[in-house]
């Protein structure tokens, strides 16, 4: 046995003689203890004072249990084992050995009664197992060192559990995203969990889906799709896999890319060829793309011609009337009336632009191309999107559309009109020189007719004479719309919601015959049908319209009557009407208003004329509108009765202003008397709005005849000097004030 080092004294042991009896001389050179005959000594882990003694006790127990006698005797003589002694007394008290025994072994040869037959001490362990605690403890440390944490019980009951393996190996150079960090190994890409990728070592089989495109080592992607065989693989030609980006959307570039794709796809499927043909194949790819380009271009041209011929056979061109289409001369057309069906040779007009164009555009372009090749038609350019780049072609196309619609409308009721039965004589006799002039004149007439339809409003009413509409030529679209709406109101046309039927013979009675119905601001109700008047209506008062503002570019383009503003008779009444009453209409004023129109058309501003007009106040129509907040708080609907007089000149002398005031006072007295005769209350409020005085201040006078308001809450406004339709340019802010 080899020389061993003494654990306690670090001395070399030269004794190699092992016998059944222990040595007489101890190796620890400590004082030999004298034991009693009744005492017994044994090795126990319960007496261990530190971890080293605990380990030694379990090692000694392992050697004895497995019959390693020589090793156990040598270990007992050298190691510091925890010893314990049991007295032979009846009490069985356990006593520990002397402190000197803790430092080394003792010579117990002279005490043969206390040792076993083999000269070894017995062991009594508190922590013990079938295979000794030391063996199980060692197996646990071995499993920890090897990374095998599962015991036999777990392996038997969890056979489907996968082993824990590291996700990122130490030799991996790939940049794996963060969302792959917690996935199981079967979900992770193979390159993330395998050896690093390099140009020479990795060639994926199949479609090449098991490599990372973002990997910096995988730069040449085109080589990944090519199989490295003995004679087929060519590294220089693999650069043609990606198309040239400088070509952009050119057809040649796309064809070149598709040629290379087909070539490489065939190389992938082709078997390996011997090395002798490798030199020939290196020279072939330089000639092959040009040859395939020519073949594919020829095939595409043939397909385009076939598609055009099929479209011409399925949808033949209709017969074209040269009068309808001025830009197609009849002498160049076919004898049967059909346009020449010659497939265009120019590649600008191909099958791609046909799908995005109308049939009329296709005909026009084919006509242009056909005559352009013959040198008869003017040249034009067409973009790839199929749109018109020539303004003349655009104008002619819209002229064709407008003329076709106009001719169809004119010949709709003519049964003898048959466009498909034209003969050669008719085409020859048709003049072709004035086609453009006729087309322009027809187009102008068509536009003029549309414009006249917008201006004219049909006045189809019973017992009403039509009045010539004014010619409005130099107004804007907004002014024309306002003019149309005012004419529609004047013509009493039917509303869109059909709430008021067009009955023109029903006219409302006078004001004193109808009581006022509170709570409804709608049109008046005609309760007594016997009181309806059937007087024929007079001239339309809304015809003579002039713009309110002299500046056309003003924000408000309103229209107002020139002199007098008349409304239908219904607005004179104070009665209300339900919403769904079929008897309520908007008739025109009576014939008795003609006198007022004749009087108001005079431009004389004499006081005598004003007096004459004011004396006929019974026939003067009034405007009834809801009152403002200054009126009384009665439950009835208050009205503002406004009597409109002709416009008066602004610059008047002092003497004339005094006379006009006297005349105004006389008019008020006359009005109050007439209101008393008609049955209304004599208490009437008069509001005078006078122009500025010589001092430059405007005055507003309010006079109360008896300081009482009328029963119906109406005011009589004297507007001799206050013309609401001729106050000039004003803004909405002034209107609010």
Swiss-Prot record:
Function: Transcription factor that regulates pseudohyphal differentiation, invasive growth, floculation, adhesion and starch metabolism in response to nutrient availability.
GO biological process: regulation of biosynthetic process
Chief localisation class: cytoplasm
Subunit structure: Interacts with FLO8, STE12 and TEC1.
Name of the encoding gene: MSS11
Compositional bias annotation for Basic residues: 646-655
The protein, known as: Transcription activator MSS11
CC terms in the record's Gene Ontology section: cytoplasm; nucleus
Keyword annotations: Activator, Cytoplasm, Nucleus, Transcription, Transcription regulation
Protein family membership: Belongs to the MSS11 family.
Family annotation (PANTHER family): LISH DOMAIN-CONTAINING PROTEIN, TRANSCRIPTION ACTIVATOR MSS11
Biased composition (Low complexity): 269-314, 590-643
Cell compartments where the protein resides: Cytoplasm; Nucleus
Annotated region described as Disordered, given as residue ranges: 1-23, 191-220, 268-347, 413-439, 572-660
UniProt feature, compositional bias: Polar residues: 207-220, 330-347, 421-439, 572-585
UniProt domain LisH: residue ranges: 51-83
């Amino acid at each position: 046995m080899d020389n061993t080092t003494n654990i306690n004294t670090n001395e070399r042991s030269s004794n190699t003689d092992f016998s059944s009896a222990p040595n007489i001389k101890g190796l620890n050179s400590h004082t030999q203890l004298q034991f009693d005959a009744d005492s017994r000594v044994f090795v126990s882990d319960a007496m261990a004072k530190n971890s080293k003694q605990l380990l030694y006790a379990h090692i000694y127990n392992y050697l004895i249990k497995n019959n390693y006698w020589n090793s156990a005797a040598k270990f007992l003589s050298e190691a510091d084992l925890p010893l314990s002694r049991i007295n032979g007394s009846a009490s069985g008290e356990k006593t520990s050995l002397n402190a000197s025994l803790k430092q080394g072994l003792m010579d117990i040869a002279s005490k043969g009664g206390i040792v076993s037959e083999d000269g070894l001490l017995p062991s009594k362990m508190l922590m013990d197992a079938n295979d000794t605690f030391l063996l199980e403890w060692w197996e646990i440390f071995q499993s920890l060192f090897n990374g095998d944490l599962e015991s036999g019980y777990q392996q038997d009951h969890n056979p489907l559990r996968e082993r824990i393996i590291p996700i990122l190996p130490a030799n991996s150079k790939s940049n794996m995203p963060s969302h792959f960090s917690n996935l199981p190994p079967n979900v992770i890409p193979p390159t993330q969990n395998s050896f690093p990728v390099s140009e020479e070592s990795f060639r994926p089989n199949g479609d090449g889906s098991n490599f990372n495109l973002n990997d910096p080592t995988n730069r040449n992607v085109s080589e990944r799709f090519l199989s490295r065989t003995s004679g087929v693989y060519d590294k220089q030609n693999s650069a043609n896999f990606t198309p040239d980006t400088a070509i952009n959307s050119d057809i040649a570039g796309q064809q070149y890319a598709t040629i290379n794709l087909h070539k490489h796809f065939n190389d992938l499927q082709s078997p390996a060829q011997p090395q002798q043909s490798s030199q020939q194949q290196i020279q072939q790819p330089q000639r092959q793309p040009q040859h395939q380009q020519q073949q594919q271009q020829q095939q595409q041209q043939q397909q385009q011609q076939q598609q055009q011929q099929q479209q011409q056979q399925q949808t033949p061109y209709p017969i074209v009337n040269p009068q309808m289409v001025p830009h197609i001369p009849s002498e160049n057309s076919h004898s049967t009336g059909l346009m020449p069906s010659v497939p265009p040779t120019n590649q600008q007009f191909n099958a791609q632009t046909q799908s995005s164009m109308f049939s009329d555009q296709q005909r026009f372009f084919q006509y242009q191309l056909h005559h352009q090749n013959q040198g008869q038609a003017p040249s034009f350019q067409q973009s790839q999107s199929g749109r018109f780049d020539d303004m003349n072609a655009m104008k002619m196309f819209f002229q064709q559309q407008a003329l076709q619609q106009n001719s169809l409308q004119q010949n709709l009721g003519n049964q003898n009109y048959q466009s498909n039965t034209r003969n050669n004589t008719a085409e020859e006799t048709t003049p072709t020189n004035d086609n453009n002039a006729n087309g322009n004149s027809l187009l102008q007439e068509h536009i003029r007719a549309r414009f006249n339809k917008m201006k004219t409003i049909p006045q189809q009413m019973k017992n009403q004479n039509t009045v010539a509409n004014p010619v409005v030529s130099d107004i804007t679209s907004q002014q024309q719309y306002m003019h149309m709406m005012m004419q529609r109101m004047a013509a009493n046309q039917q509303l869109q919601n059909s709430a008021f039927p067009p009955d023109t013979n029903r006219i409302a009675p006078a004001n004193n015959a109808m009581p006022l119905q509170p709570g409804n601001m709608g049109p008046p109700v005609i309760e007594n049908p016997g009181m309806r008047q059937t007087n024929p209506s007079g001239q339309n008062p809304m015809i003579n319209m002039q713009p309110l503002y002299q500046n056309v570019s003003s924000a408000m383009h309103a229209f107002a009557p020139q002199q007098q503003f008349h409304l239908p008779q219904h607005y004179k009444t104070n009665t209300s009407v339900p919403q769904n009453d079929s008897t309520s209409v908007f008739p025109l004023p009576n014939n008795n208003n003609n006198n007022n129109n004749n009087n108001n058309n005079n431009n004389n501003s004499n006081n005598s004329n004003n007096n004459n007009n004011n004396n006929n106040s019974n026939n003067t129509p009034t405007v009834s509108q809801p009152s403002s907040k200054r009126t009384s708080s009665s439950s009835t609907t208050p009205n503002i009765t406004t009597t409109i007089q002709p416009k008066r000149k602004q610059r008047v002398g002092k003497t004339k202003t005094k006379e006009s005031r006297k005349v105004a006072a006389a008019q008020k007295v006359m009005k109050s008397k007439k209101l008393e005769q008609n049955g209304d209350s004599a208490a009437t409020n008069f509001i005078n709005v006078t122009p500025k005085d010589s001092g430059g201040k405007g005055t507003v006078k309010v006079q109360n005849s008896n300081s009482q308001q009328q029963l119906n809450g109406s005011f009589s406004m004297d507007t001799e000097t206050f013309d609401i339709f001729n106050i000039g340019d004003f803004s909405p802010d002034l209107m609010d004030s």
